[in-house]
């Protein structure tokens, strides 16, 4: 079977611990046997980030801007315990945060729905996609500890010297406290809005945008005004043509409505809100192991995909001891497929897109049709006996068998069409 040619490169960002183990298996068994692809490889393991003073994370981000598509393995964000474990030079920032700040764009998280797998929220029949603004707010904030009595002020001085703002924020008592200053930019918010509206059009789904503008009357209301103005100027007629809607909601109201709904919509959220709610949605649909995460810029030209979960440290410890593991690799497989499909769309190569879709179907059918699954999914079905689940590698092998049969069948169909 000849390999499918991928015209332009894909940036590959390797990661840490158990996800690094399954990453290698996916690449060797599901990707490279079928694709002739130039992978621009960057090792984002915690050891390599420490060795390069985190330069490798920045380099991989700029490579993504250059080539347009990246696929990322889960990585460790170090805390004090990890600093000691790996003897790190410093507590390096989250790689995802660094990547998001360089690329900009919006992070969209979407559940992978397998009908056989029960949902914690049973009436969520359709996907709920969470769009998370990938810039600013708490994630670029400056925070300080206040250790004595004094005044906290907020100052702004314009570059032209014509405007100076000096506001008293709070007068601290002797016991001190904490303070934080955070920001966002109109350009970034507009890009966030554009990416959200574009995805709603592409998926033909209603879009909700959430803030707490009743409390943050300048900060959050600026988000709302930018969204509303862009919608009225550029998207209102397009939405009406598709019979979909856009609506701003207070976040507390939206979360309550989301829990009562059947799904089938997109929620655009500010950075922190999206971070929290995407995990809630993932759990409601079953598992973080069944959640995709993509970052896309407003112009659609820069794209990065990854699994929404972490590095699965507990399983990695078992792997290190030579013990059997049963780690769910579905979200990591979908990280690869979403990057492959995007690459195919940008390159206008239908066979690359078709391969990505076939690999997704092979993965889902392995569970839904074949009944082969990892331990976490078996437990969700109430099955606890050892025969009800397969190991980490066995699951990927089952997907590989199903994919091979689908690829052979697809090639036979092509030959039949040629004879006709």
UniProtKB/Swiss-Prot annotation:
Catalytic activity: D-threo-isocitrate + NADP(+) = 2-oxoglutarate + CO2 + NADPH
List of residues binding NADP(+): 75-77, 82, 260, 310-315, 328
GO BP term (any one): isocitrate metabolic process
Protein residues bound to substrate: 77, 94-100, 109, 132
Site (Critical for catalysis): 139, 212
Keywords: Glyoxylate bypass, Magnesium, Manganese, Metal-binding, NADP, Oxidoreductase, Tricarboxylic acid cycle
Top EC group: oxidoreductase
SMART domains xrefs: Iso_dh (SM01329)
NCBIfam families: nadp_idh_euk (TIGR00127), PRK08299.1 (NF006156)
Role played: May function in the production of NADPH for fatty acid and sterol synthesis.
Protein name per Swiss-Prot or TrEMBL: Isocitrate dehydrogenase [NADP]
Organism annotation: Saccharomyces cerevisiae (strain ATCC 204508 / S288c)
Gene behind the chain: IDP3
């Amino acid at each position: 079977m000849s390999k499918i040619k991928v015209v332009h490169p894909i940036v590959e960002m390797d990661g840490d611990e158990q996800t690094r183990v399954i990453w290698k298996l996916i690449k060797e068994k599901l990707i490279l046997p079928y694709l002739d692809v130039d992978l621009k490889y960057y090792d984002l393991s915690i050891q390599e980030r420490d060795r390069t003073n985190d330069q490798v994370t920045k380099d991989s981000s700029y490579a993504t801007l250059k080539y347009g598509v990246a696929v990322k393995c889960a990585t460790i964000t170090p805390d004090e315990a990890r600093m000691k474990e790996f003897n790190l030079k410093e507590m390096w920032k989250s790689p995802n945060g660094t990547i998001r700040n360089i690329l900009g764009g919006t992070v969209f998280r979407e559940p992978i729905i397998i009908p056989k797998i029960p949902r914690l929220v049973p009436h969520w029949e359709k996907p709920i996609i969470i769009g998370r603004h990938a810039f600013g707010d708490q994630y670029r904030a400056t925070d300080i500890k206040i250790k004595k009595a004094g005044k906290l002020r907020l100052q702004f001085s314009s570059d032209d010297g014509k405007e100076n703002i000096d506001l008293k924020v709070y007068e601290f008592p002797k016991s001190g406290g904490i303070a934080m200053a955070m920001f966002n930019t109109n350009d970034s918010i507009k890009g966030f809005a554009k990416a959200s509206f574009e995805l709603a059009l592409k998926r033909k789904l209603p879009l909700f945008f959430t803030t707490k503008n009743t409390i943050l009357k300048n900060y959050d209301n600026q988000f709302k005004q930018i969204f509303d103005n862009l919608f009225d100027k550029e998207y209102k007629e397009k939405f009406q043509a598709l019979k979909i809607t856009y609506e701003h909601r207070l976040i507390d109201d939206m979360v309550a409505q989301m829990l009562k709904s059947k799904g089938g919509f997109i929620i655009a959220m500010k950075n922190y809100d999206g971070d929290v709610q995407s995990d809630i949605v993932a759990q409601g649909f079953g598992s973080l192991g069944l959640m995709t995460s993509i970052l896309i810029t407003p112009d659609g030209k820069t794209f990065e995909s990854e699994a929404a979960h972490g590095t699965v440290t507990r399983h990695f410890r078992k792997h290190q001891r030579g013990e059997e593991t049963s780690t769910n690799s579905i979200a990591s497989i979908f990280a690869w497929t979403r990057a492959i499909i995007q690459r195919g769309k940008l390159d206008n190569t239908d066979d690359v897109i078709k391969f990505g879709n076939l690999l997704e179907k092979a993965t889902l059918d392995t569970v839904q049709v074949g009944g082969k699954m990892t331990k976490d999914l078996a437990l969700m079905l109430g099955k606890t006996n050892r025969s009800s689940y397969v190991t980490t590698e066995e699951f990927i092998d089952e997907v590989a068998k199903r994919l091979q049969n689908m690829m052979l069948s697809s090639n036979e169909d092509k030959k039949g069409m040629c004879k006709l």
